[in-house]
Swiss-Prot record:
Keyword annotations from UniProtKB, A to Z: Antimicrobial, Cell wall, Disulfide bond, Fungicide, Plant defense, Secreted, Signal, Vacuole
Protein name (record): Defensin-like protein
Tissue expr: Flower. Found in petals, stamen and pistils, but not in sepals. In particular, accumulation in a configuration surrounding the inner reproductive whorls.
Disulfide feature: C28-C72, C39-C59, C45-C66, C49-C68
A GO CC annotation given for this chain: extracellular region
Species, as recorded: Nicotiana tabacum (Common tobacco)
Transmembrane segments: none
BP terms from Gene Ontology: defense response; defense response to fungus; killing of cells of another organism
Sequence similarity: Belongs to the DEFL family.
Chief location of this protein within or outside the cell: secreted
Signal sequence residues: 1-25
CDD domains: Knot1
Length: 105
């Protein structure tokens, strides 16, 4: 009886962990354009990334580059700048709205 109770507790905790993992938003990363040199500590990298309008930044482990992060929009793999990003996001949004309209009918 005690073993089955422990197993059930473990199973519930494992399920909660998997559900919480799937709920997290995807995080897009790109190398900083303004950070100079080798990235050793997080604070200067984070400051450079925030100045580039990202939400956070950290040093890559192997290449020691400053990587800027922000939540992905529409599951895009790459972060682009300027009008190109706006056009792609508008196309993706239009496709999503069209799909929703088709599914409702």
């Amino acid at each position: 009886m005690a073993r089955s109770l422990c197993f059930m507790a473990f199973a519930i905790l494992a399920m909660m962990l998997f559900v919480a993992y799937e709920v997290q938003a995807r995080e897009c990363k790109t190398e900083s354009n303004t950070f100079p040199g080798i990235c050793i500590t997080k604070p200067p990298c984070r400051k450079a990334c925030i100045s580039e309008k990202f939400t956070d930044g950290h040093c890559s482990k192997l290449l020691r580059r400053c990587l800027c992060t922000k939540p992905c929009v529409f599951d895009e793999k790459m972060i682009k700048t300027g009008a190109e990003t706006l056009v792609e996001e508008a196309k993706t949004l239009a496709a999503a709205l069209l799909e929703e309209e088709i599914m409702d009918n």
